[in-house]
Amino acid sequence: LRHSSAASDVYKRQNMIFGLKQAKVSKEKIEEQLEKVSKFLQVDALLERKPSQLSGGQRQRVAIGRALVREPRIFLFDEPLSNLDAKLRVEMRREIKKLHQQLKTTVVYVTHDQTEAMSLGTNIAIMNHGVIQQNDTPENIYNKPSNTFVADFIGSPSMNLIKGKLKQNSDKVYFIASGSNFEIPINGYDFKEKNNLDNKEVFFGLRPEHIFFKRSDEKDFEMTLRADLSEYIGHEQIMTFDYSNQEVLAKFPSTFKIELGKETKLFFDLSQTSLFDAKSEERI
């Protein structure tokens, strides 16, 4: 399903049953399906209207109804919300989520919108130039991205990727940012392979929401970075800090007052760390 209406002069009743008529389904079955689906989608009072008389959300529901009456085993949604305004996209996203839960039918949903993918998907395949980068649950996509492309694609702002190298001392491993001597311990990290890590060039990944202005856990790692920029977006602010000439973004409540140009004490939740090989850009 992509476009929310067919020809503009076709009444919605005819629009919804078009596929059944083409398949030469009996009139009785057509009326039965039309009544059941239109009530389910709450568009039964709209069937005698033309597309120009309906709202964007109503047109989208009728388009879904046109597919539903045929009782498919799999739905393909090809960017169905791309032509809707922001408010209506949110409303229709909820509608599609409810529909999926009620029908318990397989849905293949194509979108460039990460919010749609994360909120609707039970399994997400992220593609780049036609190649699947990661096929996983939304939770694993967010918490354990398979490479820097996925890490950068998911999240707003996306994951901080700080370039540096690892230092291995016996069973202890540290991250040192390029141009810095400061060591960040990452002993709890789940490495795929823990051999030959010393001097390995990597990207240290940590999401902005896992950096805190106030300590949230005793295990949080304390850092002091210079605050360079503040972006106020209502209930929260996005702060940019300097870490060895690399930008680090963090999300804080807008009520927190942070002075720009000053050194600020921050706390990193290192349990949320991701590490990527600097050459292959794959998770290690």
What residue spans do the PLM features occupy?
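Positively charged, low-complexity/disordered segments
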Residues: 1-7
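Short, conserved clusters of charged catalytic residues that mark active-site
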Residues: 2, 91, 145, 222-223
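ABC ATPase nucleotide-binding domains
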Residues: 8, 12-149, 153
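Elongated periplasmic alpha-helical coiled-coil
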Residues: 68, 156-158, 162
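Conserved coupling/switch loops of ABC nucleotide-binding domains, chiefly the family-specific signature
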Residues: 129, 163, 273
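Residues located in well-ordered beta-strands
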Residues: 137, 149, 163-165, 224-226
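Non-catalytic connector elements of ABC transporters
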Residues: 157-159, 168-284
